[in-house]
Amino acid sequence: MKNRILVLTLASIVGFISCGKDKELVEVTIPEPEKVEKAAMGNPADVKAEDEEGAFQMKGLPYAYNGLEPFIDAKTMETHYSKHHVGYCNKLNTAVKGTDLESKTIEEILKKLDMSKADIRNNAGGYYNHNFFFDILTANGGEATDEVLEAINKDFGSYDEFKKQFSDSATKLFGSGWVWLVKDKTGKLVISTTINQDNPL
């Protein structure tokens, strides 16, 4: 008990002594917060592959970065198109340059992919997946065709049930990846998932 009182007393004395040293205090002025300027969005048409002669190029977007709002915000679209997608395009061009893959379509590359070649697997997948993603979205939304709706109703019971299962698959996907609606070998519509930049091809 005496030791505890002694320690507390010493701590108090040190605290009082350090508080009494006014000559060591320095007055500072805290600046007012700066206004943060909102970054201007670029134009998707300005995004080009580094190698203009490369086998793969940027296809362009049929809408502005903010064209899918409120469902997908402009910053997300700009990041995916002008950073991720062009990055996959540039790295894919580098990976296939001077190889027999340089003359192949992206679909041909993916269908006969050597899964051990990570640079081609990731960048070809990222290039294809993002092209597909951007192509199927429309600025004003859209409706499924009668043929697609009929197939969805046949294989999932209803469009609402399909949306629920599709959303559930996306929610359960751990990390980055994709959710796909595809036909299996029997022609039945099924929902599948792939990790990272893999795809059903």
Question: What is the role of each PLM region?
Answer:
Residues R4, G20-L201:
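Feature for soluble, non-membrane regions of globular proteins
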Residues G15-S18:
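C-terminal motif of bacterial Sec signal peptides marking the signal peptidase cleavage site
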Residues I5-I13:
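Sec-dependent N-terminal signal peptides
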